[in-house]
Amino acid sequence: MADLVVTAAQVARAHDNAEIFNGLAAETITAGQAVYMSSAGTYGIADANVVGKQQARGLALEGAAAGQAFSFIKRGPVAGFTIPQAYDARLFLSDTAGALADAAGTLSVPCGRVMALSDSAKTKVVYADFVWADQF
């Protein structure tokens, strides 16, 4: 399992057609990290090998300290990742806290796919697709 490399300063939605939500951070969150909602209604860093934290809800679009508001994307294209995987490859929550990977972690949590933008370079981005209703 290989984790995707993220450059926090470059994380941004790659298209206007996206589902974006706001939340309060339960801990320090970095742009590009996968987040989950805690039972207290705040958001922490998701992790595929910790029961409860595998309930990933999206990717942080900006960093936040504990108690600060931040935005995260539930569904849509996200730039800022180095993606060696093939176009349309499935992406999963990693056993590394906050990371996405090319294979399932301890708990299998699909999070999206590799997508090509419509530019001439066919730039690879993460197409975030976090399913809330059907998870665990």
Where are these regions (language model features)?
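Glycine-anchored, exposed beta-strand/edge motif detector
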Residues: A2-F136
